Design a protein with these regions (language model features):
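Structured, active/binding-site neighborhoods that engage oxygen-rich ligands
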Residues: 1-371
Length: 371
């Protein structure tokens, strides 16, 4: 394949990975309240719908908020020929206004606060941080990381880094979440560009140390001053390095990590992505391993799927019979609800992942990203 074909293949893998992770993981969430199906029934093939509310379901192959917000961000990047914070907020607002069943109340509330209260940011990130209204997501959760993969297509290194911070400003402005965001996006970009696992891990380790130091000296006082992070937590260089490097090294060495602490969902997802990257020989093996670990397994599977898909690419993914079947299920799923089955709900057409849309998005991101 030519360079363009190789890169667009990996970009398609990235997008498909997010969608498959969502569809495959969500039905097996441990919460019975959300209609979770026991993990023992995981076959590796998408065969259950995602439950929305008590009695409503998507059609099989329709993913949740992970893939919808990923597509919304892709649309924003393509329209802006790069990352534009205001346009990104606009596309997130459109997503909310579609009344998609996947829009969570807290996410909706926080994005609406941003749109209602925040002026257009200046070129300085400090001004942006000071202007963001306080919200419930000022903690190390994974709600920003789940939509992060498209940021890897941004060509300029510093613009890409700032885009990660801007994204976290919308819903998850926490030092841990921001650093995990930056490192994960760099890993996805390196995977898209065809770098080896060994090189990706080496560079990510260096980036973690660099970003922990940056935040220790430049950002933490601003965040704490804006009441965005708990003031009783010492977000020093040593604290950040300890927490993030411990998860990163545990993943790379195949060691277990605590998956039950709700305040550290972002690090858990970060851990899952790098565990699967370093210890899986195929997309299918990696994604099933993460789902079986429990915890926030649908979001973890989507985030992991984005990185694995970027690394393996669509053509290699399709060499596995289960993954090939899942790809066909996702891109051929019916977006509209079955009118004869009133408990089935529709996805907004804007976020439906068809073969045609997948090809167009990958080609557009290739051009924008100078990949």
């Amino acid at each position: 394949m030519s360079k363009e074909q190789c890169v667009t293949d990996r970009l398609q893998g990235m997008i498909l990975g997010v969608g498959i992770g969502s569809c495959l993981g969500a039905p097996h969430r441990p919460s019975v309240r959300k209609g979770g199906i026991h993990i023992d029934k995981l076959t590796g093939v998408i065969s259950h719908p995602i439950t929305v509310g008590k009695n409503c379901h998507f059609n099989i192959g329709i993913g949740g908020d992970c893939i919808e917000m990923t597509i919304a961000l892709i649309q924003s990047i393509i329209q802006s020929d790069g990352y534009d914070y205001c346009n990104d907020r606009y596309h997130k607002s459109i997503w909310i206004e579609t009344n998609s069943p996947t829009v969570g109340d807290t996410t909706k509330r926080n994005i609406e606060k941003i749109n209602n209260n925040m002026a257009i940011p200046t070129s300085k990130i400090e001004a942006l941080i000071k202007g963001v209204p306080l919200n419930e997501y000022s903690r190390a959760s994974n709600g920003a990381l789940l939509r992060a993969t498209p940021l890897a297509s941004i060509a300029d290194d510093e613009e890409r880094r700032l885009a990660c911070i801007y994204e976290c400003c919308i819903t998850h402005l926490n030092p841990i979440a921001v650093i995990c965001h930056i490192v994960f996006v760099e890993a996805v970009r390196m995977a898209i560009c065809g770098y080896s696992k060994k090189y990706i891990i080496k560079r990510c380790s260096e980036i973690i140390l660099k970003e922990c130091k940056n935040f220790d000296t430049q950002m933490i006082s601003l965040m704490i001053g804006s009441s965005f992070v708990e003031t009783n937590t010492n977000y020093s260089y040593e604290f950040l390095k300890k927490e993030i490097m411990y998860a990163f090294n545990s993943a790379c060495k195949g060691k277990e990590y605590d998956m039950n602490n709700r305040e550290f969902r972002c690090i858990q997802s970060f851990y899952c992505a790098f565990l699967a990257l370093t210890h899986s020989d195929s997309f299918q093996d990696g994604i099933e391993t993460i789902i079986r670990m429990g915890g926030d397994n649908d979001t973890n599977a989507s985030i992991t799927g984005g990185l694995l898909g970027a690394y393996f690419g669509r053509k290699i993914m399709e060499c596995d019979t289960k993954t090939l079947e899942n790809i066909q299920i996702v891109i051929n799923a019916e977006a509209d609800a079955n009118e004869e089955l009133s408990e089935y709900v529709s996805r907004p057409p804007l976020y439906h992942l068809s073969e045609e849309k997948l090809i167009k998005m990958s080609k557009d991101l290739y051009v924008i990203g100078l990949l």
